Amino acid sequence: MDSRIITTHMNWEEDAAELSLRPRYLNEYIGQQHVKENLKIFIEAAKMRKESLDHVLLYGPPGLGKTTLSQIIANELGVNIRTTSGPAIERPGDLAAILTNLQEGDVLFIDEIHRLNRSVEEVLYPAMEDFALDIIIGKGPSARSVRLDLPPFTLVGATTRAGMLSAPLRDRFGVVNRLEFYTVPELTFIVSRAADILQVVIREGGAEEIARRSRGTPRVANRLLKRVRDFAQVKGEGVITTEIAKEALERLQVDACGLDHIDHKLLLAIIDRFDGGPVGLDTIAATIGEESQTVEDVCEPYLMQIGFMQRTPRGRVLTPSAYQHFGREMKS
């Protein structure tokens, strides 16, 4: 995949810096108001009953704050959090080792939970439902099942693909929340807050310009802020103004709608080679040299959100807005 400044995926080099910008409690968390308000009630109720919070599923496009919310849940409950991911848990024994090391009330966060294999999922079912672990001892006819009690815990699962979760796993989550793209005012506030943490002077217009080009995603907004900060230090006396933000983002090839060179390549390929569609996902991916999953998970959600693309039974189709963005006329 091409390197892109607006990617919604986290890389290891950025992780530590990103952590410093993340809110730690619900009252610091910007946006996702309905999710935040409901979680606050559920957490307070669990604390009043002195019980573990019901299991929580968070889903939505990458970069919207699922990992951050899992940490906030643990902080609000005043418990420890253990973090892992679906691909990292390869065998039932891996999950058993994690579960048996949890303390009462702890939060277990599993990112990309849709990528758990079925044998691991089956170990998770009794753990979620009964706080128990079923272990098979021996082999063949003499094999027997032994049940170990686990301390009550809260599983927080995160996924960009809720539809790929098996029904038995999905049904065991008591709290299910979808995270939505952020508005420009919300992102402007997030950018201003991050600038304050980074000790960067930013004007309101500069924060709004970055927010407008951040694809509705806080992770992208924070990444763009850091790069615009570099331009401001060298060319703007350390102050991020509207003009500095515009110049920096244009140099980074992020346009006024938040689209980068890969989005442009994708949209222009559909316009020029397929007359605006319909065209299949795999064909688009092959045409622009990207993986189908990247196109589907990273590019398409935002293009559909801003009304540039539609998914139809016959394939992807561009809208008149996409043509207007490039100054093209749509063929009738």
Curated annotation (Swiss-Prot):
**Which Pfam families does this entry report, sorted A to Z?**
AAA_lid_4 (PF17864), RuvB_C (PF05491), RuvB_N (PF05496)
List residues binding Mg(2+): T67
Which reaction(s) does the protein catalyse, per the Swiss-Prot or TrEMBL entry?
Answer: ATP + H2O = ADP + phosphate + H(+)
The EC number(s) given in the record are 3.6.4.-
Q: What enzyme category does the UniProt record give?
A: hydrolase
Superkingdom, taxonomy of origin = Bacteria
Q: Where is this region: Head domain (RuvB-H)?
A: 256-332
Subcellular location, record wording: Cytoplasm
Which residues participate in DNA binding?
R311, R316
Fetch the SMART domains from UniProt. AAA (SM00382)
Recorded hits in InterPro entries, A to Z, give: AAA+_ATPase, AAA_lid_4, DNA_helicase_Holl-junc_RuvB, P-loop_NTPase, RuvB-like_N, RuvB_C, WH-like_DNA-bd_sf, WH_DNA-bd_sf
What family name appears in the similarity comment? Answer: Belongs to the RuvB family.
Subunit note: Homohexamer. Forms an RuvA(8)-RuvB(12)-Holliday junction (HJ) complex. HJ DNA is sandwiched between 2 RuvA tetramers; dsDNA enters through RuvA and exits via RuvB. An RuvB hexamer assembles on each DNA strand where it exits the tetramer. Each RuvB hexamer is contacted by two RuvA subunits (via domain III) on 2 adjacent RuvB subunits; this complex drives branch migration. In the full resolvosome a probable DNA-RuvA(4)-RuvB(12)-RuvC(2) complex forms which resolves the HJ.
Q: What is known of its domains?
A: Has 3 domains, the large (RuvB-L) and small ATPase (RuvB-S) domains and the C-terminal head (RuvB-H) domain. The head domain binds DNA, while the ATPase domains jointly bind ATP, ADP or are empty depending on the state of the subunit in the translocation cycle. During a single DNA translocation step the structure of each domain remains the same, but their relative positions change.
> What is the protein's given name?
Holliday junction branch migration complex subunit RuvB
Query: Lineage, please?
Result: Bacteria, Bacillati, Bacillota, Bacilli, Bacillales
